[in-house]
Design a protein with these regions (language model features):
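Glycine-/small-residue-enriched capping loops at alpha/beta junctions
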Residues: 1-103
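Phosphate/ribose-phosphate-bearing ligand recognition and processing surfaces
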Residues: 81-203
């Protein structure tokens, strides 16, 4: 049974088989998660990605992870050329990412909150979509036994807690002062969940 965890911190620091980049169809990595991955792992990641462009919205491609601790970067094409996104694009890009992860045989995989940075997609809706797709795809992905949602800040952390909790109301407002997520962006915190245990509530 796969383990799902929330982590408040930089996805580039994670020692997993593959991290996911929220990519656009041109695959340039200048801003957001892509920019952070390129700065931490080197320009070679972007060069390898751009060689595969242009790509379709909702698809996913694989490159090495450069000097990062991860082995691969899976670029989830969740943003169009103008860096706009939609729920459908996020869902399709996630499904494509899981397909690439199965091909690679990855055991551990880390996602950012797709589309919620430069794409401006609502955090609560992104969390619900991503958690729903994850619970649908993990049973089809037998090699994956550890999945992390790598988030930055209280608001994102709380919305994914809500999406994973069987007791929380969908779309509930964020209340940072009542959240168990850490206030400091550089202070990672982990909450464990088990895929397939009801709606993904706390283990």
């Amino acid at each position: 049974m796969a383990r799902i965890e929330l982590w408040n911190g930089d996805i580039c620091e994670l020692e997993v088989d593959a991290i996911v980049n929220a990519a656009n169809t041109s695959l340039w990595m200048s801003t957001g998660v892509g920019g952070a991955i390129k700065r931490a792992g080197g320009d070679a990641i972007e060069f390898a990605a751009v060689r595969q462009a242009p790509v379709e919205l909702g698809s996913a491609i694989v490159t090495s992870a450069g000097t990062l601790a991860a082995r691969y970067v899976i670029h989830a094409i969740s943003l169009d050329r103008d860096r706009r996104t939609s729920g459908g694009a996020i869902k399709a890009a996630m499904r494509s990412t899981f397909a690439r992860a199965r091909e690679l045989g990855v055991i551990s995989l880390a996602f950012p909150a797709l589309g919620t940075g430069v794409g401006g997609f609502p955090l609560d809706e992104a969390a619900r979509i991503m958690v729903a797709v994850t619970h649908d795809e993990l049973p089809k992905s037998p090699t994956i036994d550890y999945l992390i949602f790598a988030l930055r800040g209280v608001a994102a952390y709380r919305q994914f807690e809500i999406a994973l909790s069987p007791d929380a109301e969908p779309g509930a407002p964020v209340a940072p002062e009542a959240s168990t997520a850490p206030d400091a962006l550089d202070s990672p915190d982990v909450s464990p969940y088990l895929a397939g245990s009801g709606a993904g509530g706390p283990a």
